[in-house]
Amino acid sequence: SLVAKSVFEIGIIVASFAFAQILTETYFGRMSDRKAKRLLFIRVGFILCAITFGLHYFADNTTYLIIARLGAGIASGIMIPPMLAYAYEAGKGKSKVASVISFHALGWLAGIVAAGLANDEKLIFIVSSCFFIIGFIISLRLPKIQTEKIVEKGIIKKIIVKNKFLFSSLLIRHIGAAAAWTVLPIMLMEYFGAELYQVSMVYVANTLTAFLVMNLMSKRIQIQNITKFKIGI
């Protein structure tokens, strides 16, 4: 690694992003419910992501990179929950959220391809920032929809308790996936001498498959009680 000196430092850098993101998603997801202003949080998130991801270009040591990753985690955490909620409320369909998540994988694919084409560890962050600016511009054309404010207290705890087994299985799954995908590019580059574009090819295979499978599965989702789905129980 050009910045981190050990796999442990890389793990800390990766974890800092996830830690900031989960806390921010929980808080701002709840705030978007209370304020019923999905588009505001989505657009603010795009702007902050453009700034924080662009700042990665200037991170030349572990400390600065951790700060940049924390900022990126906070910025992305502001927009993701409102975006999923907006997709559900705008689509009024049981498979819309799954379709949006599949396009999340497609976005990863496009970003990975861009990283491979750039083949530069610093330039890609400028490219990433530009993508977020484009996303913000597109978000300006999204129609405003009527959303009811959800002000019930203790709803997060209720959702977690109600779905504890689902959340536990997802947590275990993501722990394994994060561990594998954190170490894999290091292994490919240090032990097999892979170039950045070759690493991106491996990631493209994963994200392309995820996009196709998610779209296929979204058409088969059946939900009996839409209201319960909306509030997460």
Model-predicted segments: where are they?
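Cytoplasmic helix-loop-helix junction between adjacent transmembrane helices
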Residues: 68-104
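Juxtamembrane intracellular "pre-TM" segments in multi-pass secondary transporters
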Residues: 142-172
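Helix-to-loop junctions at the C-terminal end of transmembrane segments
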Residues: 24-36, 212-226
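Short amphipathic helix-loop junctions that connect adjacent transmembrane helices
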Residues: 1-9, 182-198
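Symmetry-related core transmembrane helices of the 12-TM Major Facilitator Superfamily/SLC fold
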Residues: 124-140
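Structural signature of the two symmetry-related core transmembrane helices
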Residues: 40-54, 227-233
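Residue-level signature of mid-helix packing/kink "hotspots" within the transmembrane helices
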Residues: 18-26, 108-109, 207-215
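Helix-breaking motifs and short loop linkers at transmembrane-helix boundaries and internal kinks
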Residues: 36, 58-60, 193
